[in-house]
UniProtKB/Swiss-Prot annotation:
Gene assigned in the entry: rpsG
Record-given protein name: Small ribosomal subunit protein uS7
InterPro entries linked to this entry: Ribosomal_uS7 (IPR000235), Ribosomal_uS7_bac/org-type (IPR005717), Ribosomal_uS7_dom (IPR023798), Ribosomal_uS7_dom_sf (IPR036823)
GO biological process: translation
Keyword annotations from UniProtKB, A to Z: Ribonucleoprotein, Ribosomal protein, RNA-binding, rRNA-binding, tRNA-binding
GO cellular component: small ribosomal subunit
Length: 156
């Protein structure tokens, strides 16, 4: 146990174009090798594509996509008497958002062909419509938690 107090979380600054902290977190997740300006360009171009394809506000589409992807439950491995159990636990709000953004970006990267802007835009639109890889990942996570409900009493 650390003897010092808890380390405070750094506040995430709102992004310059939309003034939204969730968009900043998306940009940071897209960023590779510290190339933030490139990540910003990718995200903003993806938002332009979303605006052109759907005719809706891209930030609203992103927030809806994030809401559809954020998991409520997940499983954690817990060792009890020589056996490993997958114990379902609730996901804290901060982690919920982080996982949602991470899954959106990872499944956008995994899409074939095209530029990252188009892949990210397509994944966000799909997630907003409750389809796509990231939504499937959330469903699988919930299914795992449901299947292991019997071990819920091992929670800590």
């Amino acid at each position: 146990m650390p003897r010092r107090g808890r380390v405070p979380r750094r506040a995430v600054l709102a992004d310059p174009l939309y003034g939204n902290t969730k968009v900043t977190k998306l940009i940071n997740q897209v960023m590779l090798d510290g190339k933030k300006s490139l990540a910003q360009r990718i995200c903003y171009d993806a938002f332009e594509i979303i605006k052109n394809k759907t005719g809706k506000d891209p930030v609203e589409v992103f927030e809806q996509a994030l809401k559809n992807v954020m998991p409520v439950l997940e499983v954690k491995a817990r060792r009890v008497g020589g056996a490993n159990y997958q114990v379902p636990v609730e996901v804290r709000p901060e982690r919920r958002q982080t996982l949602g953004i991470r899954w959106l970006v990872n499944y956008a990267r995994a899409r074939s062909g095209k530029s990252m802007q188009e892949k990210l835009a397509a994944e966000l639109i799909d997630a907003a419509n409750n389809t796509g890889g990231a939504v499937k990942k959330r469903e699988d996570t919930h299914k795992m938690a449901e299947a292991n409900k019997a071990f819920a009493h091992y929670r800590w």
